[in-house]
């Protein structure tokens, strides 16, 4: 039962709302009468002359709606005493709409009139209409018009609209530079745009392509600007292959000594050692990286079953997979390449299979020095780390190894504090976190809840707060300073519970459980969402995908999207930006 005081408060609020509505209704009625009088030219004290049209109005109404008219009618300007006021360079229909707005507070903004309305609202200082136009244009921004909207916003002093348009231009630059609007830009705007660090591109060669495209559109007249334009391209960031085969062969470059020097400087950069490269600043600042994240699943025990999952549209796409069948392996993604390592068939597999997602090509490298299965792996700063695992039929290992992708060499690092296999491992903020697992593949082996972290800078391990639940074969993902352990199994069977490790607080907390118990869970995170895409329950596999929103702590069982059919699969998030579109066809 509600308290008497709360009932009175609620009643007062209701009464205030009703009173406000009544006041608004009365005001609208008064203004409606005044608008009718205006149309009948009753008591009008000013006529706006717009080209051939005469628009009657009341000074007090115009002055209350427009700061422009307020100054005009309340100062010693000539128009303050004139019955007829001429508005030069104005459109009659637009002024008619603005006058109507002054009386009714209503106006229709659409794609046909928004630019004219915004221009007039800005000139006559009618802020509500200006805001409506800005809000409308912000919703309409796309690749075909964003450059024009940015120019318009700058001319009309609309910083909020300009920021929206510019942000779109930078985020979608690879689409924008292929439009006609880009080709029509003046040299000042092009040089400013190409100089932005926030251009979102797959690689710097796209900025080069934009520059050359603009220059060639009107080559005779734009020839004098060639050096200024190409100076904004960061040639050291372009691949050596593209520089030598495409850029150096471009006639525009060959015919200009200054531009040729830029290209040669870019090629020299690739001959420098990593240490010497770090000393260079000019022309080497990276742009904002364009991403197209998908989740790759590889069949493992069924190698021909490999697919991408696209979290944007929930589609599955086949991946060509010729690699060897292997059980209990691991996979990681780094710099366009998926590395599949470890695992066994009859014996541990020594080879590491590599898949370049951009080139859609497979090749092999030497695998971990100690071949084993049930290991875990993750990547950080150009290095692939592998931990634990089990040599066939044996106990879990303390082993910790590192593969340097730059030198293509393996190195043994300090061992973990605890031996473990069938565990989880993730990179977070430059550190390597290892959680759970078991002391061996035998069913009787103890399942672990212990956790530890490795610092590559000091090459040391530190024990962390243990998980609330001991688990193995679980999913382990990093999302915004939290590490989530999802499902898996303890000594008694499958788990539906989920917990996260708060990195800052060094503590684990339980969250909402999965709507499914998984002995084996295959999951990955994109953004704030954790996707469970495959798994085994003990008597059957996961039928449909599950989604967990880490921000709302809510699970969704998506009955429209089937799960990946292979429960022993390998899973990792990949960036397919720049991949051949044929590779990604469904």
From Swiss-Prot:
Compartmental location: Nucleus; Cytoplasm
Q: Which InterPro entries match?
A: BACK (IPR011705), BTB-kelch_protein (IPR017096), BTB/POZ_dom (IPR000210), BTB/POZ_KLHL7 (IPR030599), Kelch-typ_b-propeller (IPR015915), Kelch_1 (IPR006652), KLHL7_BACK (IPR047060), SKP1/BTB/POZ_sf (IPR011333)
The pathway it acts in is: Protein modification; protein ubiquitination
Question: Which positions does the entry assign to Kelch repeats?
Answer: 294-336, 337-382, 383-430, 431-481, 483-528, 530-575
For this record, the Gene Ontology CC terms, alphabetical, are:
Cul3-RING ubiquitin ligase complex; cytoplasm; nucleus; perinuclear region of cytoplasm
The molecular function GO annotations come to: protein homodimerization activity; ubiquitin-like ligase-substrate adaptor activity
**Chief location:** nucleus
Query: Which branch of life, at top level?
Result: Eukaryota
Q: Which UniProt keywords apply?
A: Cytoplasm, Kelch repeat, Nucleus, Repeat, Ubl conjugation pathway
Subunit structure, per the record?
Homodimer. Component of the BCR(KLHL7) E3 ubiquitin ligase complex.
PANTHER family, per this entry?
KELCH PROTEIN, KELCH-LIKE PROTEIN 7
The molecule here is called Kelch-like protein 7
